[in-house]
């Protein structure tokens, strides 16, 4: 079974990686600096090997651990090194669609920006989305949409389900 994760920035089957669309540390640092200025938000830095959080608010930690089984608490997200950085997930206590997305949608010219749930939004490398990743994998495997089964549970799965 092949899994497409982190908004399409990563795909793997067992130990075989099919796709990895990471972001460089400087880019991620700039994004984190901007997000930290938005009231009511907490950040998950999603890497290939683990997710990283610095905020310790109980509701946020509970929500982050619900979606990331490998989740490390760190003193500062900017100190994370040695992992491929795939996505920044923003948890917004005030509602992603109403609060953080309007303040971050200007990033869409250079990044994939998606509201992924009532309180979640994601920022990843431009072109990283589950539909495009699925299409690439279908081409590599020589299979059609009719021969593909997908499962999704959030708004960021829509492009994959349509594919």
Enumerate the language-model features and the residues they cover.
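Conserved acidic, metal-coordinating active-site core of Asp-based
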Residues: 30, 34, 38-151, 155-160
């Amino acid at each position: 079974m092949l899994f497409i994760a982190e908004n399409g920035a990563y795909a793997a089957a067992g130990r075989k990686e099919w796709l990895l669309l990471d972001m460089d540390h400087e880019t991620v640092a700039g994004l984190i600096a901007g997000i930290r200025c938005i009231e009511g938000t907490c950040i998950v830095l999603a890497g290939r090997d683990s997710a990283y959080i610095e905020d310790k608010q109980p509701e946020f930690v509970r929500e982050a651990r619900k979606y990331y089984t490998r989740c490390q608490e760190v003193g500062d997200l900017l100190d994370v090194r040695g992992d491929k950085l795939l996505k920044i997930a923003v948890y917004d206590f005030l509602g992603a669609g109403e609060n953080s997305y309007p303040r971050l949608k200007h990033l869409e010219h250079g990044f994939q920006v998606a509201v992924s749930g009532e309180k979640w939004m994601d920022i990843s490398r431009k072109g990283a989305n589950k539909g495009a990743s699925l299409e690439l994998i279908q081409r590599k495997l020589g299979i059609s949409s009719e021969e593909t089964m997908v499962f999704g549970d959030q708004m960021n799965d829509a492009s994959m389900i349509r594919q």
